[in-house]
Amino acid sequence: MPPSGKIEVAEEGNRRKGEMTPSEMRQCATDIVAWFTQHADLDAKGCDQSVIDELSKKRDVPLALEELWREAATDVWFEGYQLLHPQSIGKMLSDIDAPYVPFARDIDDALLVVGDDAVYEYEMGDGRGDRLSSSIADYLEAYRNKLLEGRFEYMDGDGCVETMASAPSRGK
């Protein structure tokens, strides 16, 4: 019998349907911090809940970000962006347009912010830039997966850089 021309793609693995649950967000934060503990000698110290609550009074803080801060308040890197302590964020909010909450900064003071649950790049003089992810939970999960797949290595003071083995082929 000739093929029908119909192609079916088999999806492997255990894909989640819908948003992350609170326990999945907690596990994601734990996995990210564990990676930095192992690869960057991170001495993880979570943030006191009262500090997170104080920030939450000023801006809407997504649960996925709260879970990360409960595990580690600083020294986690998102490639070249370092996680900001919630206390320092509270002091920055007067310079950042609402509803955005900065959560990481690079060496040039560019920020990663979350607003309306999406993740964006943010420049202090220019405001919101490119959208990086539709939600902070998706952003953290994708980053965690890349860390655990061995696609990044930690470079002291520079953050995480993509490993050569995972870099796209440049051709001949």
Question: Model segments located where?
Answer:
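A surface-exposed partner-binding patch
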Residues: 2-116, 154-155, 167-172
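Generic structural signal for residues positioned in beta-strands
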Residues: 102, 118-120, 138
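Short, surface-exposed beta-strand/loop "edge" segments at domain boundaries and coil↔beta transitions
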Residues: 109-113, 120, 126-133, 161-162
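Compact, glycine/acidic-enriched structural inserts
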Residues: 123, 127-154
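Acidic, proline/glycine-rich low-complexity IDRs
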Residues: 142-172
